[in-house]
Amino acid sequence: MKPYPIDLVSVVIPVYNEEASLPELLRRTEAACLELGRAFEIVLVDDGSRDRSAELLQAAAERDGSAVVAVILNRNYGQHAAILAGFEQSRGDLVITLDADLQNPPEEIPRLVERAAQGYDVVGSIRAERQDSAWRRWPSRLVNLAVQRSTGVAMHDYGCMLRAYRRSIVEAMLACRERSTFIPILANGFARHTCEIRVAHAERAHGESKYSAMRLLNLMFDLVTCMTTTPLRLLSLVGGGMALAGFLFALFLLVLRLAFGAAWAGNGLFVLFAVLFMFSGVQLLGMGLLGEYLGRMYSDVRARPRFFIERVVRATPSALPSALQRVGFTSSSSEPSTP
């Protein structure tokens, strides 16, 4: 593993209704990036916010000497689609993702850059002493366990988006055109050298989490069905096992009927109903799982864009930080863009 040269660091942050936390987020992220001793840019992606987040991002990008790039999506597409939109607009040799809620402190960014410079393709993170409530922690643990078992990708904390990706890994992810994706797993599929570090975790200071219990459940379905066919194989094994169990149980009932007469068969009616309901439930579960896969195939075949960028606002060349100008990254002040 060889050291990886990093001249420009991009920090990509998806934003959805985070008006209250944005001023502190910008201040702390810029302060952390200034400690790097490298050129940097902060790419903030507004994912169809209903508050004033988009206005604040645009104002931040238009400041003199700002390193902020504001990417405004026309509506809400979801966290991972917003991150991919930020990837498209980023230019760094190393791209770091960070949530806007400040639960993962931006002050951890220099540690990620340090490990990535050692030659790692992907640097993940594990939330130490997680500060979320129990109803948030337990579903997250179930999601982590289910994904680890089904995908075989060994990661400890899929829900922590504070991660660093080498530029080549980002380009590989952008080349994938499937509609449903999960960035940490996708990145690990392309990475040769990966590592994880423990990072601090704080309570959410502003607003509420955008992930409800139902959204976590939907996320688990997305993870399992868009990244692996293991559930289909497991369903085949379960179906075969239940068919064998049903045959053996029917044979057992036949023997009992012959041995004890028809009266006993009448008493076993409720057992038969219970077995029938069990088999019907498994069949319906299998049909639902197949429907998930077919639905995702249909979405991929239509090949619609994963997101639509309404506008991108960057600093003018004269307003760019001197470090950015030295490496030659300049652009116009505002540019409409489509994926």
Swiss-Prot record:
A GO molecular function held by the record: undecaprenyl-phosphate 4-deoxy-4-formamido-L-arabinose transferase activity
Top-level lineage group: Bacteria
Organism, as annotated: Pseudomonas aeruginosa (strain UCBPP-PA14)
Disulfide bonds, paired cysteine numbers: none
GO annotation, cellular component aspect: plasma membrane
Function: Catalyzes the transfer of 4-deoxy-4-formamido-L-arabinose from UDP to undecaprenyl phosphate. The modified arabinose is attached to lipid A and is required for resistance to polymyxin and cationic antimicrobial peptides.
Primary location group: membrane
Keywords: Antibiotic resistance, Cell inner membrane, Cell membrane, Glycosyltransferase, Lipid A biosynthesis, Lipid biosynthesis, Lipid metabolism, Lipopolysaccharide biosynthesis, Membrane, Transferase, Transmembrane, Transmembrane helix
Pathway: Glycolipid biosynthesis; 4-amino-4-deoxy-alpha-L-arabinose undecaprenyl phosphate biosynthesis; 4-amino-4-deoxy-alpha-L-arabinose undecaprenyl phosphate from UDP-4-deoxy-4-formamido-beta-L-arabinose and undecaprenyl phosphate: step 1/2; Bacterial outer membrane biogenesis; lipopolysaccharide biosynthesis
Transmembrane segments: 235-255, 269-289
Enzyme Commission number(s): 2.4.2.53
Organism placement in taxonomy: Bacteria, Pseudomonadati, Pseudomonadota, Gammaproteobacteria, Pseudomonadales
Gene: arnC
GO BP, sorted A to Z: 4-amino-4-deoxy-alpha-L-arabinopyranosyl undecaprenyl phosphate biosynthetic process; lipid A biosynthetic process; lipopolysaccharide biosynthetic process; response to antibiotic
Alphabetized InterPro entries for the sequence: ArnC_tfrase, Glyco_trans_2-like, Glycosyltransferase_2, Nucleotide-diphossugar_trans
Protein name: Undecaprenyl-phosphate 4-deoxy-4-formamido-L-arabinose transferase
Keyword Transmembrane helix part of the UniProt annotation: yes
Main EC class the enzyme belongs to: transferase
